[in-house]
Amino acid sequence: MTELAGMPVLEAAQGAKDQHMVINMGPQHPATHGVLRLVLEIDGEIIVRIYPKVGYLHTGIEKTCEAKFYQQVIPLTDRVNYLDPLSNNLCYCLAVEKLLGLQAPEKAEWIRVLLAELSRLNSHLIWLGTHAMDIGALTVFLYTFREREDILRLFEAVAGQRMMTSYFRIGGLAMEPPLDFFDRVQAFIRTFPEKIDEYSNLLTGNPIFRNRLKGVGILSAADAIALGVTGPPLRASGVDFDLRRDMPYSGYEKFQFKVPVSTDCDCWARYLVRLEEMRESVKIIQQALDGMPEGPIKADAPKIVLPDREKMKTQMEALIHHFKIVTEGFAVPAGEVYQGIEAGHGQTGYYVVSDGTAKPYRVHMRYPSFATLQALETMCKGRMLADLVAVIGSIDIVLGEIDR
C-alpha cells in the first residue's frame, strides 16, 4: 500500500493476503448523520485505520461574523449546531456580555437555564431516536420525535421559530414569554419522565441493542482527555466534569442536579449517561419553574439593549436608541474573552476578540463534535466494520459543528 496526501491508495496488484482494502463511508450515508466522509482502511471486516474527511458543510460562518454587528451574530450561531440552537445563543451572548461588563437580569438568567435544558432534551431526543434506528430499533425513533415535537412547539411559542430560535439577546431576552408558556412547560415535564422510562424499557433490556453497544467503542479516560473530548462521551469514560457544576454560568450554581458518570467507557455507557442526563434536565427545569423570579428580562443598558415596542411608541429617546442600535450597532470595549458552556454535545466555547468597534474583530467557535470525531479511530481500531455504525451514533456528532 502506498500513501498519497496522507491517505492510503490501493496498488494495482491484487490478491495478496496482506493487502488491506480502502473503502469510502459517506459523504452520503445515513449512519454518518450528515455529510461526513470516512476513508476506511480494513483488513477483511476489521478496521485498521479511519481517515475522517471533513469540509463538505463548510459555511465560512466565523468569517461572516466579522462583517456583522454583535447583535446580528446571534442568528448565525443557531445554524452551527442546529440541533441545540439555544445553547449556541447562550454561549455567544455570555461572551459578549463579559466584554461589555454587562449582567443580564436574574429572571432572564433563569429563563435562559430553562430553555437551555429544553434545548439539551431536544438534542438528546434526536440522538436517541437516530442512534436506536441505526441499530435497528425503529420504534424508539418514532417515540422520541413525538416528544421532540412538543419541545419544538414550546420553542415556537416563546421565540416564533421551531429550530433557528435566535431568542437570547446580549443583555437578556428578545421578549417576555407568553403568559401560558410556563404552564405548557410544566405540562410537558410532568409526563416526560414516563417517556424516558418508556425508552429505557424498549432499549435497556433489549439484548440485541445491548450486545451491539456493550464493550464496543472503548475510549479510556486518558484518551478522552488527550483528544479533547467533552460532554457525555467524556463522562462515560469516567471523567466527572460538567461546566454547569464546576464552572457555573447563567445562575447554574443555584440549581441542584447530579452529573451522570460511568466508568465502562463504551457505547453502552454513553447511552446510559445521556439517558440519565435527560432525567437531570427535567429536575433543573422543574426548579426553574418553581423558583422563577419576577422582574425585567432585559438589562438596563439603553445604548446596548433594544427597547420594548411600547416605549418606542411613546418615548422619543427610546426610538432614537433603537434607531442607532439597528443602524450603527454598539461599540464593545477592546479586548478578548473566552466563554464556555456545557451544551448537549459537550463543551461549546466562544472566543471573541473586539477592536473597540461595533463589529467583532474575530469570533472563534469551539464546538465539541470536532474533538469527538478525532477519537473515532481510537474507539474503532480493531473492531468489526459493523461496529462503526454503533460508535458513530454513540458519540453524537453534528457536522455543522465540525465544518463551520
Regions found by a protein language model. Give the residues of each.
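Metal/cofactor-centered catalytic core regions of large enzymes
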Residues: 1-404
